[in-house]
Amino acid sequence: MNNFLISLALQESSTEVQGGLFDFNATLPLMALQFLALTIILNLIYYKPLGKILDERDEYIANSLTAASAALSKANDLTKRYEQDLAESRKKAQDIIKNAQQDAQNIVSSKIKEAQKDADQLMSNTYDQLNIQKEQALQNLEKQVDILSNQIQIKLLGN
């Protein structure tokens, strides 16, 4: 039986045509068609949706970057505006404080001048009243001196 199998194998090998690297039979175009079909199927099922997802992702990233840069620009503009408003408000507040200090200083100066004037007038009035009282006291003393002088003279001369 072994001999039969060996002889069959030898017969089989002698009937086959020995080819080179490729055998050009019906399997080669079939493999090419299978490759093209697989490429088309993969393109439709996998690559197009994947490409679409990647494109949408790129578009989303670009839109997000655009929106973020617009928001950053707006935030920078608002920051500059608020800083300018703050600087202007500080300047106005400093001007108001300066004017209030000047007004207060003027009021204090005028009150001091008025108080000094009132004090000078009060001293002048007091000095005048004291002079009047002094004159009256001197006149009273002169009268009393005259009366006492007359009484002393009468007592001395009359005795």
From Swiss-Prot:
GO molecular function: proton-transporting ATP synthase activity, rotational mechanism; proton-transporting ATPase activity, rotational mechanism
Keyword Lipid biosynthesis: no
Entry keyword set: ATP synthesis, CF(0), Chloroplast, Hydrogen ion transport, Ion transport, Membrane, Plastid, Thylakoid, Transmembrane, Transmembrane helix, Transport
Membrane-spanning parts: 30-47
Membrane topology: Single-pass membrane protein
InterPro entries, per database record: ATP_synth_b, ATP_synth_B-like_membr_sf, ATP_synth_b/b'su_bac/chlpt, ATP_synth_F0_bsu_bac, ATP_synthase_B_chain
CDD domains on file: ATP-synt_Fo_b (cd06503)
Subcellular localization, as worded in the UniProt entry: Plastid, Chloroplast thylakoid membrane
GO CC term (a single one): proton-transporting ATP synthase complex
Subunit annotation: F-type ATPases have 2 components, F(1) - the catalytic core - and F(0) - the membrane proton channel. F(1) has five subunits: alpha(3), beta(3), gamma(1), delta(1), epsilon(1). F(0) has four main subunits: a(1), b(1), b'(1) and c(10-14). The alpha and beta chains form an alternating ring which encloses part of the gamma chain. F(1) is attached to F(0) by a central stalk formed by the gamma and epsilon chains, while a peripheral stalk is formed by the delta, b and b' chains.
Misc. remarks from the entry: In plastids the F-type ATPase is also known as CF(1)CF(0).
Similarity section: Belongs to the ATPase B chain family.
Function text: F(1)F(0) ATP synthase produces ATP from ADP in the presence of a proton or sodium gradient. F-type ATPases consist of two structural domains, F(1) containing the extramembraneous catalytic core and F(0) containing the membrane proton channel, linked together by a central stalk and a peripheral stalk. During catalysis, ATP synthesis in the catalytic domain of F(1) is coupled via a rotary mechanism of the central stalk subunits to proton translocation. Component of the F(0) channel, it forms part of the peripheral stalk, linking F(1) to F(0). The b'-subunit is a diverged and duplicated form of b found in plants and photosynthetic bacteria.
HAMAP family the UniProt entry points to: ATP_synth_b_bprime, ATP_synth_bprime
Protein name as catalogued: ATP synthase subunit b', chloroplastic
